[in-house]
Amino acid sequence: MAMTLLSCNPDDPDAPTTVKKVSIMGDSYSTFEGWSNVDMAGNPNDYYVYYPHEGNTDVTSVDKTWWYMLCQKPEFELEISNSNSGSVVSNTHYNGLDVTGTDLSFMHRVGKNSFGVDYNGDPDIILVFGGTNDCWARVELGNYVYKNWTDADLKCFRPAFSKLLASLQAYYPDATVYSITNGDEGFPGVSKSYAKSINNICKHYGVTNIVLEDIEKVDGHPTYAGMQSICEQVYEVVGE
């Protein structure tokens, strides 16, 4: 888990610095070719990747992604970006497609993959950045359900997000889980109802929820400036 190194603090060079391993559970916002489409052991997966494909945005190198910048801070190191472009928290994709049991569902990406490698590694921190595609695909919110989830429940967002957080806390008991919400004003973020749902579910599980503001985007996706803003806003919370 976390490692203790010599301090990088010029005001107190003898103070120890604890380096925490960070895993990202995300969608297109957290992808990058050659990073998010391989697992912890380097095995290729079938994840879709948004960045840095030509013409998407000016995020043309991995060091321009929010998560890479965050993990360059002295107190963090990247465990893995377990991120699949287009993925949904629930088991319902665009046009009502059922993605139960596939890596297009966040819920499936907990524990071991088909190679026997843990999707999220051995993290100290897990940053869950999802819900955008559920909202854009108009997945039904459903009811607040905190146990005994049915297949029908998990095709709706609220029960699925609840199960995701519960599963992460159970499977990675030594990790701290945070949620990142893509705004609360609608496209190119999530709607107020989605944002409120995420916040309510986070409160139930004692998960800190980071609601992003003023993220520069092109075609609904963060630019380099947007990535910098995400990094800064997330660091303000997890870097405390």
Residue ranges and their predicted role:
Residues 3-18:
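Bacterial Sec-dependent N-terminal signal peptides
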Residues 21-33:
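Acidic-leg catalytic submotif of subtilisin-like serine proteases
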Residues 21, 78, 174-176:
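Residues at the starts of beta-strands that form the adenosine-phosphate
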Residues 28, 41-44:
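Catalytic nucleophile serine of serine hydrolases
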